């Protein structure tokens, strides 16, 4: 381990010798894309954990934030049940072998910014019957799972996307646990599992399920034969399990959600590494049926990646650009649209995005929750920092946001923090008319 650490330090210094412009705008519908800067190893910097202590994340004036659960076991995504119970999926997955020395080094660097807690492989239920932000009940809702991540409820059927299977459970309203056996709707690609998370959403009418399956590599270096059914979004028939890929070349679709105005499917996507600190921006996009988003042959439409082998100019010619850039290497892992008018005012239509934070650029990016305004079902402005403070003044990480979830009946935003193993709750503290311009508070 000492040798790995020393090698990582030396190569990180080497990779930091070059740079790309740091002031190019990289959010919104038309991000500026600098020239490629491939390197032996990417510039790597991770914010080492320090914990929250007696602090908490920072929210704008007019809002309050509190922890509704602590000491979880790697919380990822969440789901609100019709009675207001909050489900939290907890787990760690992935078992991809390291192919190259830089894979070992990158793995070591990334491990410095993660929790030492073992994943719970469970779904925890939090019941806050009076809505005061302090749950009266916390219990294991479903145990003995295999790295659960995405969840969706259709009627009285609860669907859970594990790293290797989509499962269905019978849900009884008001129940505090499920002990009956699951039904496997369909197996999910799990060989190697370079990107293990399986995001999940249900169509607006509940007839279809959508699962996001990430690639098995950064840019195809394991060979394209192991990328079968990877870097795709599957549409799955809820009753039969029959599935098809509705979008391809979408490197790592880490969260899926239905946009409520148009009922369109949207995703946040983690793009590729090792082309420099300003390439390639992660993004938010509508998932279009039949669209090819470029991976691994191109990015942001038809910008060719020379590292992909074999080259496929025929596919590049069909590649579509995503809708909205979030910034390079922010690691967007959470997506939730507001419904019911949201918080009103500037927060009446749009999406919350949880940005887990970078590991492969010298200036840290992400480590926050942003708000993306929408109008008429489309992004309509620049992203706005909403919940910050995950990086302290000393540059260390207090937490790292993953899933985000807006609970319309209670006008609350929940944030899963998998570094401090906390779920946070953001609510209006005063009228939101003043919240749009106020100074941040902790």
Protein language model features and the residues they cover:
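Conserved beta-propeller blade signature
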Residues: 85-87, 157-160, 208-212, 264-268, ...
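Short loop/turn segments immediately following the C-termini of beta-strands
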Residues: 83, 91-92, 163-165, 171, ...
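Surface loop/turn motifs at the tips and blade-to-blade linkers of beta-strand repeat domains
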Residues: 67-72, 139-146, 184-192, 245-249, ...
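Blade-loop segments of beta-propeller domains
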Residues: 97-153
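Beta-propeller domain segments
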Residues: 19-59, 97-99, 105, 109-113, ...
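Asp-box/WD-like beta-propeller blade repeats and closely related beta-sheet repeat scaffolds
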Residues: 134-157, 162-203, 215-218, 242
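C-terminal motif of bacterial Sec signal peptides marking the signal peptidase cleavage site
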Residues: 13-16
